[in-house]
């Protein structure tokens, strides 16, 4: 097989895998509700605003629990706050 053809096939495979990975990332994100328009009935607007409020709460909620990535895990281990060594606060340094 031609070396140039191998290079193009490898680039095509990498691009395909990149699109697959990006597709899986976007599937996990909630979709914004559709706006019914300005002349929609009050019931439709109430449903839309309720769905919009729910959407905003989903994308801005605090995430608690074991959702740490490897980077935050390493930084927590190196400079993290523990019971024996509490993290210093900026305000404590200005207590003069």
From Swiss-Prot:
Any S-S bridges, and between which cysteines?
Answer: none
A Gene Ontology biological process in which this protein takes part is: positive regulation of circadian sleep/wake cycle, sleep
Q: Which residues carry this modification: Tyrosine amide?
A: 64
Q: Has keyword Signal? A: yes
Of the GO CC terms on this record, one is: extracellular space
Q: Which UniProt keywords apply?
A: Amidation, Cleavage on pair of basic residues, Neuropeptide, Secreted, Signal
The residues forming the signal peptide are 1-28
Q: Where is the protein situated, by its record's location annotation?
A: Secreted
Is the Secreted keyword given for this protein?
yes
In which broad location class does this protein mainly occur, judging by the first location in its UniProt entry?
Answer: secreted
Q: Which GO terms describe its molecular function?
A: neuropeptide hormone activity; neuropeptide Y receptor binding; type 2 neuropeptide Y receptor binding
**Which family does the similarity line name?**
Belongs to the NPY family.
Q: What does this protein do?
A: NPY is implicated in the control of feeding and in secretion of gonadotrophin-release hormone.
What name goes with this protein? Pro-neuropeptide Y
Protein species of origin? Danio rerio (Zebrafish)
